Design a protein with these regions (language model features):
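Feature recognizes metal-dependent phosphohydrolase scaffolds
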Residues: 1-239
């Protein structure tokens, strides 16, 4: 990123860093963020059933005018220096980005402690648990506005409530231990889905507005609307 100050990626609480450290951190932050948006775009293209096409935003940038089309409106981009983004194929990695991804994958796969931690989580963890007659669960139970369980499509089948937690937990484990390569890949992609999809119990908001918070000044674009579950959390009839 050369002389790019990467001001959209300024670190909070970075007073303890030298000017050169802050500059390097901001450039690294921007570089890996663009890689993230590209990688996510590739997953979305592989899985249109995830319903996340609206989160693919790189191809909605007008690179000549410096604006982003979002929700039928145009917004001025705060940063338009994207030397690694090809407007004709914005989600393709450059050779350097592909090399970074390969090295990161090798580092994760060969990190003994990380592998131990993941094995521990799979052995001891779960998305929900019944303990002392109490139901403990991560995040939220996706609900409709009327308080009923929301049906969610996972790889062509509908799930809701407990069944949704069960199938997501199942795919997380497949991502690590499935013998069939296709099922293992589906499990890995599902872990990303669980992290940021509006129908995921572990996220529970209509979008993860990372891109908008980086590149758009308008606060309206930063808003992340929570699932109705959070409005009904104290409603005894719903519970």
């Amino acid at each position: 990123y050369g002389d790019d100050p990467c001001t959209c990626f300024q670190l909070k609480g970075s007073d303890s860093y030298s000017a050169s450290e802050r500059e390097m951190n901001q450039k690294m932050h921007k570089a890996i963020s663009i890689i993230q948006f590209k990688a996510e775009g590739q997953i979305i293209k592989r899985h249109p059933e995830f319903g996340l096409e609206k989160r693919n935003l790189l191809h909605h940038i007008d690179f000549e005018r410096g604006v982003l089309e979002l929700g039928g409106k145009e917004y001025k981009m705060l940063d338009m220096n994207f030397p690694t983004v090809d407007p004709k194929d914005p989600y393709a990695f450059t050779p350097e980005e592909a090399d970074i991804m390969e090295r990161l994958e090798r580092a994760f796969m060969n990190c003994e402690k990380l592998q131990q931690h993941m094995k521990f989580l799979l052995a001891k963890g779960s998305l929900y648990k019944v303990y002392n007659n109490n139901l403990l669960y991560h995040g939220c139970v996706p609900l409709n506005k009327d308080g009923t369980f929301k049906e969610v499509e996972i790889y062509g089948k509908q799930y809701k409530g407990k069944a949704l937690y069960d199938i997501l937990d199942n795919y997380v484990r497949k991502g690590f231990v499935a013998v069939d390569k296709a099922e293992r890949e589906k499990g890995r992609d599902m872990m990303w889905y669980i992290w940021l999809n509006e129908n995921s119990p572990l996220f529970g908001k209509d979008k993860m507005a990372t891109f908008e918070r980086y590149f758009l000044a308008e606060k309206e674009t930063h808003k992340e609307v929570k699932n109705p579950y959070y409005d009904m959390l104290e409603n005894e009839e719903v519970l």
